Structures are given as C-alpha cells and as structure tokens.
Amino acid sequence: MAGISQHGKAFIRPKAKAHLLIVEARFHDDLADALLDGATSALEEAGATYDVVTVPGSLEIPAVITFALDGAAEGGTNYDGFVALGTIIRGDTYHFDIVANESSRALMDMSVQDSVCIGNGILTTENDAQAWTRAKRSEGDKGGFAARAALTMIALKEQLGARS
C-alpha cells in the first residue's frame, strides 16, 4: 500500500478513492479555518473526496457523525470515514473537562464499538498559543494529521477485512 508520511511516520492510503465527512466545530473560527485547511489539503493530496458539515461546538461532533451513519443506513451518503475538527481551550470552569472528555469518549466509542474510521482532530489546550501551535499547517498541522489518521484507519479496515 502506498504511504504518506508526516513527522517520519507512515500513513497508509486506502485502496479505493475514499469519501469522508469532515465535521468541524466553529466555536473558535480562526482556529477552525486552520484545522480545516490542514484536513482538506491532506485529503486532496491523498486523492480523497469529502463533504464538510459545521457544528457550533466540539460536543456536537459525535451526534452529527451518528446522524451521517443513520442517514447512510437509510440510503443517504455512505462515508468511508470521518474527520472531527474542533478546539477546546481551558477556561475557568469545569466545562472544558466535560466537553473534552465527552466528545473524545463518544468518538472512541463509535470507533471501537461500531468500526467507524475517525480521525480525531479536536484540540484540547490550555491557551490560544498552544492551540495555534497545533492548528497551523506550518507547525503542528493537527487538521492534516486527523485527516491522514482517518485515511489510515480506512486502509487498515480494508486490509484487515473489518466489518462496515
């Protein structure tokens, strides 16, 4: 299988042209733009196609992925995988922990229990500076990393013959 690399680690491309759904949270618009830029660039570089759905915040991302899976079961678009993009920056309340933990848990549950290929690009940071370091394509490129992770999971699912 052809590989793509980032930071010296191989990413595997799916055999067939993959079609993904990017679900992006717009709570921090500028950071969302940077994450989306990285994700779409990585998918285009890999020859994948994608749709984008925007949600208010990261906590809504898992629900939209579930809506898409339910829609596919009813004859709607069948996505090979998903890219979750958002930024959660710690504030003065417990809300950060709830959003970070619950969005991550829900994505992991779908991935493990339902064999859903998800690249998790939801940043959880202490401040804006950390978020920008991770979001910018010229630095951390976590949007691109999440897209390549989703593609790798699609390829591994194909390779291992996992259920759809």
Swiss-Prot record:
CDD domains per UniProt: Lumazine_synthase-I
Catalytic activity reported: (2S)-2-hydroxy-3-oxobutyl phosphate + 5-amino-6-(D-ribitylamino)uracil = 6,7-dimethyl-8-(1-D-ribityl)lumazine + phosphate + 2 H2O + H(+)
CC terms in the record's Gene Ontology section: cytosol; riboflavin synthase complex
Pathway assigned to this chain's UniProt record: Cofactor biosynthesis; riboflavin biosynthesis; riboflavin from 2-hydroxy-3-oxobutyl phosphate and 5-amino-6-(D-ribitylamino)uracil: step 1/2
Record-linked InterPro entries: LS, LS/RS, LS/RS_sf
E.C. no: 2.5.1.78
GO molecular function: 6,7-dimethyl-8-ribityllumazine synthase activity
Subunit structure as annotated in this protein's UniProt entry: Homopentamer.
HAMAP family given in the database record: Lumazine_synth
Function comment: Catalyzes the formation of 6,7-dimethyl-8-ribityllumazine by condensation of 5-amino-6-(D-ribitylamino)uracil with 3,4-dihydroxy-2-butanone 4-phosphate. This is the penultimate step in the biosynthesis of riboflavin.
Record's protein name: 6,7-dimethyl-8-ribityllumazine synthase 1
Organism whose genome encodes this protein: Mesorhizobium japonicum (strain LMG 29417 / CECT 9101 / MAFF 303099) (Mesorhizobium loti (strain MAFF 303099))
